[in-house]
Swiss-Prot record:
Belongs to the Hfq family. One of its GO terms (molecular function) is RNA binding. This is RNA-binding protein Hfq. GO terms for cellular component: cytosol. The lineage of its organism: Bacteria, Pseudomonadati, Pseudomonadota, Alphaproteobacteria, Hyphomicrobiales. It comes from Bradyrhizobium diazoefficiens (strain JCM 10833 / BCRC 13528 / IAM 13628 / NBRC 14792 / USDA 110). The keyword RNA-binding applies. The gene is hfq. Transmembrane segments: none annotated. Keywords: RNA-binding, Stress response. The keyword RNA-binding applies. InterPro entries: Hfq (IPR005001), LSM_dom_sf (IPR010920), Sm (IPR047575). PANTHER family: RNA-BINDING PROTEIN HFQ.
Length: 82
């Protein structure tokens, strides 16, 4: 059940930043920093676009994703129902 919730949060987050075209900074596990906008994603990878170029990034290589602006995924602020 926890795995389902984590997947749903991941999909909710990625879908939100894709729809709103929120700029992201993505850190890979090897320390590389990528920046851009998510244009597409699936269970294994995401497509990051910047300056007219696209990069296919495998999710297993991602350490951290930081939005360039505050986002609100759920109504009612930061508190989430269990």
């Amino acid at each position: 059940m926890a795995a389902d919730r984590a997947q749903n949060l991941q999909d909710t987050f990625l879908n939100h930043v894709r729809k709103t075209k929120t700029p992201l900074t993505i850190f890979l596990v090897n320390g590389v920093k990528l920046q851009g906008i998510v244009t597409w994603f699936d269970n294994f990878c995401l497509l990051l676009r910047r300056d007219g170029h696209s990069q296919l990034v495998y999710k297993h290589a991602i350490s951290t994703i930081m939005p360039g602006a505050p986002i609100q995924l759920f109504e009612g602020g930061e508190d989430q129902p269990a």
